[in-house]
Amino acid sequence: MPHVRRPELITVEASPTEVQEVAQRDLGLTPDADGALTGPLPNWADTGARQRLETRAVDGHATEVALGIENATRVPYFEWFLGPFLRRGARRALRHTAARLEAALEGRPPPPEPRRRTPLLPPVPFAPQAIALLGTVAAIAALANFGGALFGQTADSVTKTFGASNRGLGVALAVSRGGVLISLVAAALADRQGRRRLLLICFAGVCVTNAISAVAPGFIIFTGAQAMTRAFANGAFVVAGIAAVEEAPEGARAYALSMLALAYGAGFAIAVVLLPISDVAPQAWRIAFGISALSIFLLPRLARSLRETGRYIDLTRRTVRRGRGRVREVFARAYGFRFLLLGLAAFLTNFFSAPSAQLTNRFLTDEHGYSNTLIALFRAVTAGIPGLLGIIIAGKLAESRGRRPVAIVGLVVATIFQVMFFLGDGAVLWFAATFAIVAASAAAIVLAAFDTELFPTEVRGTSNALLLVCAVTGSAAGLLVATNLDDVVGGLGPAIAICGVAPLLAAAFVMPWLPEPADRELDDVSPSEV
């Protein structure tokens, strides 16, 4: 997190000695070697940051006080985005400290704590190690999602290159999810080999398989490569979510997942930004896959900045490798019912979300005559700021109101507006898509929180791997149903809309039975069995 370049300056009617005595007594500061006073910054986002107070005598009895922040941790890879929000929050924290100091010197009651926080600041402080890990994990997730989203965005151009029909596209998209067995193995191995190693392997796998896709001579080879891409991308998503939750402080697990979701969105946005390239030439879509492949050159830097999660390190110190990742523990009495509910939720929600996400571009192109450039604009308008808004809302409400209500309301609202989108025309498309992405983003954050929070550390990877199988099975089923019903129901839009029944069933009959993990410590929600 950034240093405050300009200190907060105030002038008080007191001597430097009086100011220092009051600062030590009321602000908890202690003398430093250079004569300044330093100490923790209360209620700030970074536990490693310290406030620094320097005094200088001015006219008569007055003293100029300079308040600043030192040892602030920078957010790797995302300082460019979070920096302005953090600097504003730091400035607000220093002003509050200055107000406390002035009140103490004048004998007044201390001012109330600031009520409003910068929207993207965490609800509780993060340790420097957690900041570094979350930033690096988010960067890997963004790059993996960029690579994994390319097929869905360029599907129309790819199928035209290889002469595939809607049905062929549906089969290819379903087959591309057939690599779930690799995802299953990768995510499960995270319990035995560690989060760090598997996350790096999955990222490298996305790059290599997209390199194959970029030069694929035929649709079969391309589809096979994308099956592997999807497998590695899904594995990266699962392990990234686990790492983010395990390293987050209590009270900020949903916030950590919301920041990870912002990174996913950034990766998806890159895929959308590159979409107009497909209009340049019949096979220009290959350029986007090539760019994804080139991101493998970032692997050494990512490996240097990524460390293992503290919870997993603690687990390895008290268990042997074969005691971790046992499938039978997922289905045991303590966690079996949770897995059944989450597996059903994963299948039902993905039965609709997969065709809704993967076939939207095809729907806009075939049924509404959108060009790739117009689709890119549509995505930017309806998914950019609205998606960010949904993620921020979910991160805050999931901690303050609970996971269950946010998940249920989010699923219902998102499904209703998505169905309106696929059955609508004209301005309805833009209106419905905007509100759908807000609600869908909120629901997705909470569902990811359930998946990671409701299982203990030793099987968190294995349980999420099995849930991924349920999700991918639902995705494949939804894609096949939607692409085979389009001729029967009069178009791709109505066919996808029919699939919207599934998440409504999940919201009504599955989500209410899940335990509520909000306001509870992670180890109390899912105590270890080893």
Over which residues does each language-model region extend?
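Helix-breaking motifs and short loop linkers at transmembrane-helix boundaries and internal kinks
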Residues: 163, 194, 215-220, 249, ...
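Helix-loop-helix hairpin linking two adjacent transmembrane segments in secondary transporters
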Residues: 260-304
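Structural signature of the two symmetry-related core transmembrane helices
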Residues: 197-212, 405-419
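Cytoplasmic helix-loop-helix junction between adjacent transmembrane helices
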Residues: 225-262
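Central cavity-lining transmembrane alpha-helices of secondary-active solute carriers
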Residues: 173-188, 381-393
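Extracytoplasmic
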Residues: 132-164, 353-361, 478
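Glycine-rich segments within core transmembrane alpha-helices of 12-TM secondary carriers
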Residues: 252-275, 279, 467-479
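Extracytoplasmic gate region of multi-pass secondary transporters
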Residues: 151-156, 334-388
